[in-house]
Amino acid sequence: MSRNYNDELQFLDKINKNCWRIKKGFVPNMQVEGVFYVNDALEKLMFEELRNACRGGGVGGFLPAMKQIGNVAALPGIVHRSIGLPDVHSGYGFAIGNMAAFDMNDPEAVVSPGGVGFDINCGVRLLRTNLDESDVQPVKEQLAQAMFDHIPVGVGSKGVIPMNAKDLEEALEMGVDWSLREGYAWAEDKEHCEEYGRMLQADPNKVSPRAKKRGLPQLGTLGAGNHYAEIQVVDEIFNEYAAKKMGIDHKGQVCVMIHSGSRGLGHQVATDALVAMEKAMKRDKIIVNDRQLACARIASPEGQDYLKGMAAAGNYAWVNRSSMTFLTRQAFAKVFNTTPDDLDLHVIYDVSHNIAKVEQHVVDGKERTLLVHRKGSTRAFPPHHPLIAVDYQLTGQPVLIGGTMGTCSYVLTGTEQGMTETFGTTCHGAGRALSRAKSRRNLDFQDVLDKLADMGIAIRVASPKLVMEEAPESYKNVTDVVNTCHDAGISKKAIKLRPIAVIKG
C-alpha cells in the first residue's frame, strides 16, 4: 500500500532554514535518520520530485532523491545519518550528492558501489596562472583550439600519451607517482591532490581484463558527459587570506579547471563489483530496500576486492587528470611562447567527487574508523587536519566546485562544523534538475552554443548533441548550492570563477 504525498510529509521536518530531517519510518528498516541541505529554491525542487513520484511519475527508473537518502539510511552498519547535500539528485542506488559513513569495526557494515558511482574518482583539478584576462582575451580562440588539439575529447577518444599494458598496471598501482616518474607531472602537483594522488590499497589484479582493455586507450582523455576543461577568470574573492594561500591575488587572474574521471575503466570496475555483490548478498543474507543498493560486507572477499579495484580506478583518474594537466601546460606554453613554469601553471588542488575511503571521525564523542562513501560530494576537511597539505593547514582544504558548462565555478574551504555535521563533506557542483533525455528533448543545441557565444565564451565541442544535456538549464543553480553550504556552515566560499573558454567531450 503506497502512501500519498501528505502521509509522506509527516516523516519530514525542518531542522533550520537550510536543513531538513527524514525521520525513521519514511522507508522501511532505517537504522539512522536522514538529512538534506537546501535553500528555498532547492527545497521546492526536492518536494516537487517527491510529489511527482507519489503520483506515479517516476524519474527514468530512479526513486526520488529523498527516498534514496532514506534507503541508504537502512544499509547495515551506517552511522550517525544519511546525508543529502544541496546538489542532490536521483542516481543509481545512492542519490548523487548523498554521502554516508559505515563503521569499519561493525562486522555487518557494508560497502556499496552505488555509493561511489560508476565514474570512480570523477573529480576536478584547478590550475592557476600568472596571466590576466587581458593577456588571454586576444588569443582566446587560439588557446581554446590549442587545448582542443592537445587533449583528446569525446566518448571514444584515445589518448596521446604512449602507454602499454605494463604502464597501465603501474599507473593503476602508483597514481600520480607514475605520472611523476614518467615526466608528466611536477613534484609539487602531488602535494595538492587529495590522497596525494595515490590510494595505497590499490591492487591492479582486482581490475578485470575487460576494464583494463577499456582503460588502456583512454588515458589522458576528456570523457563526454559532464566532463570538460575550462579556461576561467577570477570573478570574485570572498576570502583574501585563503585565496592568497592558493596563489590567487586579484580579480581577472586566469585559471584552468579540468573535470574528468576514470572513463570506461572505472565504469567497468563498478559493473563487475555489482555482479559479484549480488551473489554475495544472497550468501550473506543482506537485505536492502532497493536492488540498486547492491553491497557487500566490508570485510568480505567481494567487499575487499571492490575497495582495491576502486582504489586502482581512483589512481587511474588521478593519472588521467595529471596527463591532461601536462597537455594543458603544453598548450599554454605553445600559445604564449614560453614555459609552463614561467606561466606559474601550478595545481591549486585536485579533489575527488566519487570515492569511498577509510577515515577517522568523531561520532557521539568517540573516535571511530569509518568507510566514508562520497558520491557527487567532496571531502572538505577543516584547518589543521593532518591529511591536508602544509600550505592549506591554516585555511582548511580547498574544495573545487565545477558549475555547469558556461556558468560560474567556486573554490570553497572546509570547516570544523562540516567535520561534525557531514563527516567533512560538502557539495560537488550544480546537480541535475532535468534528466539527460529530457534536456535533449527540450533544448536545441544551436541555442545553447549561441548563448555561450553571446556571453563571450569560446567553445570547442566534440559531440554537439551532448551540449544540451549539459546546458545550464539542465542543472540546479550552482550559486544556490554553494550558498546553501556556506549558510549551513559546512563549507565557506573563497573564490568565484567564470569561464571564458570551454573544451568539451
Curated annotation (Swiss-Prot):
<protein>
    <recommendedName>
        <fullName>RNA-splicing ligase RtcB homolog</fullName>
        <ecNumber>6.5.1.8</ecNumber>
    </recommendedName>
</protein>
<keyword id="KW-1017">Isopeptide bond</keyword>
<feature type="binding site">
    <location>
        <position position="504"/>
    </location>
    <ligand>
        <name>GMP</name>
    </ligand>
</feature>
<keyword id="KW-0597">Phosphoprotein</keyword>
<dbReference type="GO" id="GO:0005525">
    <property type="term" value="F:GTP binding"/>
</dbReference>
<dbReference type="GO" id="GO:0017166">
    <property type="term" value="F:vinculin binding"/>
</dbReference>
<dbReference type="GO" id="GO:0072669">
    <property type="term" value="C:tRNA-splicing ligase complex"/>
</dbReference>
<feature type="active site" description="GMP-histidine intermediate">
    <location>
        <position position="428"/>
    </location>
</feature>
<comment type="function">
    <text>Catalytic subunit of the tRNA-splicing ligase complex that acts by directly joining spliced tRNA halves to mature-sized tRNAs by incorporating the precursor-derived splice junction phosphate into the mature tRNA as a canonical 3',5'-phosphodiester. May act as an RNA ligase with broad substrate specificity, and may function toward other RNAs. Essential during post-implantation development of embryos.</text>
</comment>
<dbReference type="GO" id="GO:0005829">
    <property type="term" value="C:cytosol"/>
</dbReference>
<dbReference type="InterPro" id="IPR001233">
    <property type="entry name" value="RtcB"/>
</dbReference>
<dbReference type="GO" id="GO:0005654">
    <property type="term" value="C:nucleoplasm"/>
</dbReference>
<feature type="binding site">
    <location>
        <position position="409"/>
    </location>
    <ligand>
        <name>GMP</name>
    </ligand>
</feature>
<keyword id="KW-0547">Nucleotide-binding</keyword>
<feature type="binding site">
    <location>
        <begin position="226"/>
        <end position="230"/>
    </location>
    <ligand>
        <name>GMP</name>
    </ligand>
</feature>
<feature type="modified residue" description="Phosphoserine">
    <location>
        <position position="300"/>
    </location>
</feature>
<feature type="binding site">
    <location>
        <position position="353"/>
    </location>
    <ligand>
        <name>Mn(2+) 2</name>
    </ligand>
</feature>
<keyword id="KW-0464">Manganese</keyword>
<dbReference type="GO" id="GO:0006388">
    <property type="term" value="P:tRNA splicing, via endonucleolytic cleavage and ligation"/>
</dbReference>
<dbReference type="GO" id="GO:0005789">
    <property type="term" value="C:endoplasmic reticulum membrane"/>
</dbReference>
<dbReference type="GO" id="GO:0005635">
    <property type="term" value="C:nuclear envelope"/>
</dbReference>
<dbReference type="GO" id="GO:0005737">
    <property type="term" value="C:cytoplasm"/>
</dbReference>
<keyword id="KW-0963">Cytoplasm</keyword>
<dbReference type="InterPro" id="IPR036025">
    <property type="entry name" value="RtcB-like_sf"/>
</dbReference>
<keyword id="KW-0436">Ligase</keyword>
<feature type="binding site">
    <location>
        <begin position="402"/>
        <end position="405"/>
    </location>
    <ligand>
        <name>GMP</name>
    </ligand>
</feature>
<keyword id="KW-0539">Nucleus</keyword>
<dbReference type="InterPro" id="IPR027513">
    <property type="entry name" value="RtcB_euk"/>
</dbReference>
<feature type="cross-link" description="Glycyl lysine isopeptide (Lys-Gly) (interchain with G-Cter in SUMO2)">
    <location>
        <position position="496"/>
    </location>
</feature>
<keyword id="KW-0832">Ubl conjugation</keyword>
<keyword id="KW-0819">tRNA processing</keyword>
<feature type="binding site">
    <location>
        <position position="227"/>
    </location>
    <ligand>
        <name>Mn(2+) 1</name>
    </ligand>
</feature>
<feature type="binding site">
    <location>
        <begin position="428"/>
        <end position="431"/>
    </location>
    <ligand>
        <name>GMP</name>
    </ligand>
</feature>
<feature type="binding site">
    <location>
        <begin position="353"/>
        <end position="354"/>
    </location>
    <ligand>
        <name>GMP</name>
    </ligand>
</feature>
<comment type="subunit">
    <text>Catalytic component of the tRNA-splicing ligase complex.</text>
</comment>
<keyword id="KW-0479">Metal-binding</keyword>
<comment type="similarity">
    <text>Belongs to the RtcB family.</text>
</comment>
<feature type="binding site">
    <location>
        <position position="119"/>
    </location>
    <ligand>
        <name>Mn(2+) 1</name>
    </ligand>
</feature>
<feature type="binding site">
    <location>
        <position position="122"/>
    </location>
    <ligand>
        <name>Mn(2+) 2</name>
    </ligand>
</feature>
<feature type="binding site">
    <location>
        <position position="259"/>
    </location>
    <ligand>
        <name>Mn(2+) 2</name>
    </ligand>
</feature>
<dbReference type="GO" id="GO:0001701">
    <property type="term" value="P:in utero embryonic development"/>
</dbReference>
<dbReference type="GO" id="GO:0170057">
    <property type="term" value="F:RNA ligase (GTP) activity"/>
</dbReference>
